[in-house]
Amino acid sequence: MDEKKNEIILFENQGVKLEVNLKDETVWLTQEQMSKLFGKAKSTINEHIKNVYKEGELIEKETMTKFGNSEFADKPTNYYNLDMIISVGYRVKSQNGILFRKWATSVLKDYMLKGYAINQKRLEYLEKTI
C-alpha cells in the first residue's frame, strides 16, 4: 500500500475508534484493528482469516497487502480489504460482531430495495472539505 496515495478516515462507533486506510476503492484494516472493531482477540481474528482462505471464500493475494515498517515491527504489517473485513464480521461471535452484521445487512437491504445506500456522515464530511 502506497502511503502517499492513501487516505485515512476516522471510524467511530459504540466506543470503537479506528483510523481506517482508504485506497483503491476499499478500506484496509490490520488484524489488530479488526480485533478492536469486533471486540475479539487478535488470535481469534487470525484464525477466522486463515479459515476464510483455507475454505476458498477469498484469495489472499486479492484481499491482503503488506504496508510499511513501524518502529515496533521488523517487517511490514498485513492489511486486509473490505471483503475480508466483511467475511470476518460474519464469522466472529461478539456483541460488536452482531452490530456489524446488522449494519451490513441494512446497507445491503438499501442497495437491494432502493438501488443505493448513503453514508450520511461521510457525505457531510466530504461536503465540508470541498
Feature-to-residue mapping (PLM):
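Positively charged, aromatic-accented nucleic-acid-binding surfaces
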Residues: 1-31, 37, 69-130
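Alpha-helical DNA-recognition elements
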Residues: 51-55
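Short Lys/Arg-enriched helix C-cap and helix-to-coil transition segments
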Residues: 56-71
